[in-house]
Amino acid sequence: MDQEMTTVASPDIRVKATSPDSNRAVLEQSIVLSDSGRLDEGSSIRGGELERDSQEVGRETVREPLMCHDLDIHALAQRGDTAAIAAMLQENPSLNLSARDAQDVTPLHWAAINAHMGTCRLLIDSGADIDAIGGELKATPLQWAARNGHLYVVHLLISRGADPNIHDSQGFNTLHLITHSSAVMPLLYMLHQPVAIDEKDTDGHTALMWAAYQGDALSVDLLIRHGASVNSTDNAGMTPLHWAAVKGNKVSIMHLVEAGASLDAKEEAGKTPRDMAEELRGLVPFQKGLEEAGWSIDGVKMEGKLGPRNTILAIFLLPIAVLWLIFSTFKWLPVYVGVPFAIAEFMGMQYTVVLVLLGHIKAQDKVSTSNYFASIITASLIWVGYCWISRFAVNTPGYAFSNLGFIIMFVGCCWTFWTAIVTDPGFVPKGQQDAEIKEVLEDLVDAGRLNGTNFCIVCMARKPLRSKHCRTCNRCVARFDHHCPWIWNCVGAKNHRSFLLFVLFLIGGIILFIRLTIAYIQQNAPEYIPTPNPGLTTCDISTTLCQAGDFDPFLLCMALWSTLQLTWTSVLAISHLWQVSRQMTTFEVSNLGRYGFMGGRGGQSLRDQSGAMLKQAAAVGAGIGMSGAGEEAAGPPGAEAGPEGNALLPPPGGHVHGPQCRHGDHARGHSHGVLHICGALWKTLTGPLMTILGLDRFTKGKALGGMKRAGRDQNPFDMGMVKNCIDFWLPDNDVDYMTVYEIPPGGWRAYRRKLAMDKRVPGGKGRYEVVSEQEV
């Protein structure tokens, strides 16, 4: 049954009740006053909120001044005309700020639902009833703001004493309504307020049930990690897993099952979650969710036969044996027979790892998260070392310097490879205590900066500049570069140098290994004599390769295998050396190509993003004063980012790209011509190879475009090539990237000078401070 809130005055907000399936209040339509004071029924509304021009995001909308008598206080509050309300109060100090309009709604309700921070603050400071219950749903201003996910309005109201535990006529409290909004950051904030996480509405639904029904996997995960019950039941006996099965969201199902949700729970009609999924034709996502959680469709826990530790050991040993088998195959069989056998042996290794050793893991990235690729590098190093000891050490006279150089490169490669694997890449510490997390949240909300750019909802920690949440490691990494399966670790602030040294040592070692291989063959191999009958010739390639293959096929295969690694490692080394010289990471270069700025979605550059953050903080009223701005400063409701992403803010230039844009035919769609088909086919064939070799970061997206755009104006950390290289190769531990949260007003150079000064002066603080330009 639809319920409506109407008013004799023009503002009209309609609310209707829906799922599951009869009692969720959602915003249907809003008629707002235009800048001219007339009613606009065709205005673009999202979540009950007038879509403002992107230039207006983060500040009060500028409107033509109106006389107080032109509109009543309710219409002014809905407009967010703080100045007019202030003038009205000055003219009539006894004005009733809790007066009701025809819908039984107060001005604070209208200001809250439209996210007018300045108006809300003025009304509260002037004595408006903060917990006034109004409208047909008998809700408070806090509940109206929560329904639309207005984080900063919710924070303002709660900080001024609003009660989040009041229920409206449908039995919803503030936590239920924020869950309805699907906005993650407001939900996170509310979970650290004095609310009962398992409070039920009139029909017995908890916030977790609502999140599961909506398919909001982030909200489901957040509620579970804050202690929500996964086995509570509503009035119909349905659990959160039942509602997740109704929606068919596999990620929500996975989170619930991992948290211990019962697969055998039955609702009042005797149906389990699986029964409901099958009845609603959602068995496929339900099964995938179970598999990714480590369960079979029959409710049996899937576990590896060897156990985690033995599985790692088996994956480590398997490439050692298989590489020996592949290289020895060419010793036992002719080339034309050995090649198919070698391919079959390699594919057999792949099959064993993926389907046998890791067969119980259904995650798509299970191979890249395992030690498989690192084991291939380890096996290669073992057999290269074996070849040097058994062949080059005593059988290459006259190449002492090459042998010495190879030993240095080999030892350096092994050492840096090991350190890159075991070194903490710069994992940002996770939040542990609720009080500590709440303090960080309150600080960020007060500053108007609680969003995915600054806080990770998975790690429950504030995110430093240049950091990123790695989905593979499931941790935030300071000065994140990329996740490298070849070192079984992320590359970040603390192990980036070890990683690059490993690559450089590897390249140098391969070059010297190839040189020593050629010298060994030339000095020790007998003269190659082809078969006398041309029809029986077994080697039609160069005489040198035929001679090497006939003399020592194992060594030749090892040299060719090493040469293959030389290709991608050379590209990797060149790109990283270039990035080091520009004080950039692979992730930042990729962002430049995709978004036009380094730090992800949020501004044209890190410099611009920081400026935008300061403007946003001022706009949402973080400072002292009556003026404020709408919630739009933090992005529209529900636009909060996940753990590996940033808030979707409109670009500073004011233009928002969409279907209405006309930037040429290429901007409107894609081509299905021959070139497009060939390009797609090429990507399909080479994509997996590029991923395995680690070259995908240079080919996917617009990474190459990012390299072209990597100018100094877009990089506030660039101190010049020489200083950048010194900073990378000779670190003095001045900069702790795990605690740098913003660019100082004086710039990065000023910050570095201040750190150096503090280090030289006895008693210097030696830590991050905001530095003014006058101090340097």
UniProtKB/Swiss-Prot annotation:
<feature type="region of interest" description="Disordered">
    <location>
        <begin position="38"/>
        <end position="58"/>
    </location>
</feature>
<feature type="topological domain" description="Cytoplasmic">
    <location>
        <begin position="575"/>
        <end position="776"/>
    </location>
</feature>
<feature type="repeat" description="ANK 5">
    <location>
        <begin position="203"/>
        <end position="232"/>
    </location>
</feature>
<keyword id="KW-0967">Endosome</keyword>
<feature type="transmembrane region" description="Helical">
    <location>
        <begin position="369"/>
        <end position="389"/>
    </location>
</feature>
<keyword id="KW-0564">Palmitate</keyword>
<feature type="transmembrane region" description="Helical">
    <location>
        <begin position="312"/>
        <end position="332"/>
    </location>
</feature>
<feature type="transmembrane region" description="Helical">
    <location>
        <begin position="403"/>
        <end position="423"/>
    </location>
</feature>
<feature type="repeat" description="ANK 2">
    <location>
        <begin position="103"/>
        <end position="132"/>
    </location>
</feature>
<keyword id="KW-0472">Membrane</keyword>
<dbReference type="GO" id="GO:0019706">
    <property type="term" value="F:protein-cysteine S-palmitoyltransferase activity"/>
</dbReference>
<feature type="transmembrane region" description="Helical">
    <location>
        <begin position="554"/>
        <end position="574"/>
    </location>
</feature>
<comment type="similarity">
    <text>Belongs to the DHHC palmitoyltransferase family. AKR/ZDHHC17 subfamily.</text>
</comment>
<feature type="topological domain" description="Lumenal">
    <location>
        <begin position="333"/>
        <end position="336"/>
    </location>
</feature>
<dbReference type="GO" id="GO:0000139">
    <property type="term" value="C:Golgi membrane"/>
</dbReference>
<keyword id="KW-0808">Transferase</keyword>
<keyword id="KW-0677">Repeat</keyword>
<feature type="repeat" description="ANK 4">
    <location>
        <begin position="170"/>
        <end position="199"/>
    </location>
</feature>
<keyword id="KW-0333">Golgi apparatus</keyword>
<feature type="topological domain" description="Cytoplasmic">
    <location>
        <begin position="1"/>
        <end position="311"/>
    </location>
</feature>
<comment type="function">
    <text>Palmitoyltransferase specific for casein kinase 1.</text>
</comment>
<feature type="topological domain" description="Cytoplasmic">
    <location>
        <begin position="424"/>
        <end position="498"/>
    </location>
</feature>
<dbReference type="InterPro" id="IPR036770">
    <property type="entry name" value="Ankyrin_rpt-contain_sf"/>
</dbReference>
<feature type="active site" description="S-palmitoyl cysteine intermediate">
    <location>
        <position position="484"/>
    </location>
</feature>
<keyword id="KW-0040">ANK repeat</keyword>
<feature type="topological domain" description="Lumenal">
    <location>
        <begin position="520"/>
        <end position="553"/>
    </location>
</feature>
<feature type="domain" description="DHHC">
    <location>
        <begin position="454"/>
        <end position="504"/>
    </location>
</feature>
<keyword id="KW-1133">Transmembrane helix</keyword>
<protein>
    <recommendedName>
        <fullName>Palmitoyltransferase AKR1</fullName>
        <ecNumber>2.3.1.225</ecNumber>
    </recommendedName>
</protein>
<dbReference type="InterPro" id="IPR001594">
    <property type="entry name" value="Palmitoyltrfase_DHHC"/>
</dbReference>
<feature type="compositionally biased region" description="Low complexity">
    <location>
        <begin position="629"/>
        <end position="645"/>
    </location>
</feature>
<feature type="repeat" description="ANK 6">
    <location>
        <begin position="236"/>
        <end position="265"/>
    </location>
</feature>
<feature type="region of interest" description="Disordered">
    <location>
        <begin position="628"/>
        <end position="665"/>
    </location>
</feature>
<dbReference type="InterPro" id="IPR002110">
    <property type="entry name" value="Ankyrin_rpt"/>
</dbReference>
<feature type="repeat" description="ANK 3">
    <location>
        <begin position="137"/>
        <end position="166"/>
    </location>
</feature>
<dbReference type="Pfam" id="PF12796">
    <property type="entry name" value="Ank_2"/>
</dbReference>
<keyword id="KW-0812">Transmembrane</keyword>
<feature type="topological domain" description="Cytoplasmic">
    <location>
        <begin position="358"/>
        <end position="368"/>
    </location>
</feature>
<dbReference type="Pfam" id="PF01529">
    <property type="entry name" value="DHHC"/>
</dbReference>
<feature type="repeat" description="ANK 1">
    <location>
        <begin position="68"/>
        <end position="97"/>
    </location>
</feature>
<feature type="transmembrane region" description="Helical">
    <location>
        <begin position="337"/>
        <end position="357"/>
    </location>
</feature>
<keyword id="KW-0449">Lipoprotein</keyword>
